[in-house]
Amino acid sequence: GSSDNHKARAGSGYKEFARKSMGDSWGAKDNLTWILEPERGASFYSTGGLVAVHANKLDRDEIYDSLYEREVYATSGERILLWFNLTSESEIVPMGSETQISSNPSFEVMAIGSYKQLPGCPDYVSSSMKKDEITRLCLNECYNPSDERNLIDRIEIIKIQPTENLSKLEDAIQDPWKVFNCEDKGEGCSITFQDDDFMKEKISSVYYVRAIQEETLAVGGDPLRCEYNEQGECIKIKPCYASGPKFDPEDDCLAPIGERAWSSPIFLNYQN
């Protein structure tokens, strides 16, 4: 989740640029002898993810309370909004909760895409900070939202049940269990669903959700950059090098991906 990387630019996934300065993609220009080969991992790094919490207000105690209660979700870097609740006539149980249930569970999900970004920095930043300080902090590219949001493409539901049979994990981890395509018009996507098999199976289950945005360019989105044949097989690669003589400092290795947010689970214990 968190963009706690070694460049000290937390939350750097708001714009996709400068892969070596905004993320942990690093390595030497020249060939060196390493005990470990950092580019083997560095070629696959993104700009960093985010941890998001549902808090009543923006102060330390409220944020830490939400983290403790697990009412928290992660994103791949974009500031996507996500809610996931167990619903009933008497109460709403949020993501991160554990409860007992004696009927088929019903859920609701709402996701709203992140704001599309404008270049540069807002006027209030330039008027309150020195230019060299802005450059040092964010390379003159601040979080600078427009009035338009990225669209949510789909919502995926994952269902997990306990098992001791490791040879059939696909039966226990249904990923995805359900997929809901969205018709987002710029105001987000809301869905409801029910597990009609819960009382038949009589097995405690875990559920979590992923909200996936429409594709946008991302640093390291396709680090191998395969060339495919007509059968869809990768026949040639053009890796996104992070070091060595083939490293290109001007190449951010941008490729389209669906940025995403994924919730904390809801744990349901079957009650007879």
Which residue stretches match the model-derived regions?
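C-terminal functional module detector
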Residues: 1-272
